[in-house]
Structure formats: C-alpha cells, structure tokens
C-alpha cells in the first residue's frame, strides 16, 4: 500500500483570501494549452495573432468552467443545488463535470467560429490535442482534494484517503491518478502524435471523443460513483459511463465520416 501524500487543498492563504490547488490546476491547464496552441498557430492560420488565440482560449475556458459546473449540477446533483442554489458558486470544493464542460466548449467554439470565419470542426480539431493538458491538471486537483477515489482494493498501490473524505478508511484505487495517466498523459500523446500529420477535418475531433470515452468508461469500473447517484443501471453502469457512450459512438462516426468524404486534407494542428 502506498501512503497518501496529504496536501493542504489551500495552496496560499492571505488573510480571508484562499487560493485552492483545485483552482490553480485549472490555471495551469489553461496556460499549458495556450503555450502549446501558440506553437501550432501558424499551421492553423498564419493570419491569426497571439491576441486572437488568447481570445479563443479565454472563451473556451469560460465554456469549460460554466459548462462544467452546470453539467455537474444537472447530471449529478440537481436536487441538492435546487435546495441551496448558492452552492453552485462554490467551485473550489470540486463538483465539475467533464461532459458539461465539453458541451460548454462546443457551444463556445460555435459562437467564436461564426465571429471569426472558422468552421466548428476547424476549431475543435485545433484544440482537441490541447484538452488533455487541462484534463490531467484537473485530475491532480481531484487527487489533492482527496475526492473521486476508487473502490476498495488490495493492489500494492492502493491508498487510504483522509478521514474527512473517506470515513471508512479503506485502501482504495487512486482512480484520480488512473484518469490522469489515461485522460491526461495517454490521450495527449495519442492526439499530439496523430495530429502532427495532415488529417481530414473532423478526424482529430473524432479521435478525441473516441479515446476519451473509452478511457473514462474503463476507469469508471474501479471508481466509486457519486453517492447521491450510485449505479444508474444493471448494478454497474455509472452516469459517467452513460455519458461516454455517445462520445464513443460519435467519435467513431466522425472518424468514419472524415475518411469517407472528399474534403481537402488539412493539418489538424
């Protein structure tokens, strides 16, 4: 069994002002995505300035934050937030939904593309290889918060999470780290390498949806579902898995469509 490295969720406290690691992970993810996007900016559109790229990253980040929070409220704990709506704004305590953030990003990309003469999939193919940076950083934030841990297990790398998070004090799968490895590291490597060569429009977006859906679906088998939801069907299906099914199907369809129509191949950057 490995010791859980207890880290204060508050990174910096300046009087009443508290800066949480969870929030810093979002900033790290957004900043890292911007840096890598700037490296591929000329391949995407030589006429774009760094300022326009910053605008894109800003609006997509707003889509992640607003969509992620509202997605968690709607998909995972609507009753509690209806009972106390002020809880919606306590984002430093966790409670973000990837699938909600994904919807938020798509809506932001649609809006930004129309204002800047870019198609939806041009933008999505550009940003898809950058998303795993934010996903990986977010999972580290979950780990520091000691939330979203896995089922009890006797594997050698099991961890006992703090009593405030897990009163049962059982050795558990560190599922946040599994998700960091798959959704952060593995997904980044797959998409970054795949997008280095010219790909048909929609192909990189399809690869993102497919592999994220697969990785998340797998990890959900060892992750404890949200207590207020539990398993929603068959005694094993979680909300996360249910939301991944359309991503997997949609990803396969986009890849098939990308390679079975006749667009001009562009660098998917």
Swiss-Prot record:
Keywords: Cell inner membrane, Cell membrane, Membrane, Transferase, Transmembrane, Transmembrane helix. Its main location: membrane. PROSITE patterns: LGT. The chain crosses the membrane at residues 17-37, 56-76, 92-112, 120-140, 174-194, 202-222, 237-257. GO terms for biological process: lipoprotein biosynthetic process. It is a multi-pass membrane protein. Pathway: Protein modification; lipoprotein biosynthesis (diacylglyceryl transfer). One of its GO terms (molecular function) is phosphatidylglycerol-prolipoprotein diacylglyceryl transferase activity. It comes from the Bacteria. GO terms for cellular component: plasma membrane. It is found in: Cell inner membrane. A 1,2-diacyl-sn-glycero-3-phospho-(1'-sn-glycerol) binds at residue 139. It is an enzyme of class 2 (transferase). Its EC number is 2.5.1.145. Catalyzes the transfer of the diacylglyceryl group from phosphatidylglycerol to the sulfhydryl group of the N-terminal cysteine of a prolipoprotein, the first step in the formation of mature lipoproteins. Belongs to the Lgt family. This is Phosphatidylglycerol--prolipoprotein diacylglyceryl transferase. It comes from Pseudomonas putida (strain W619).
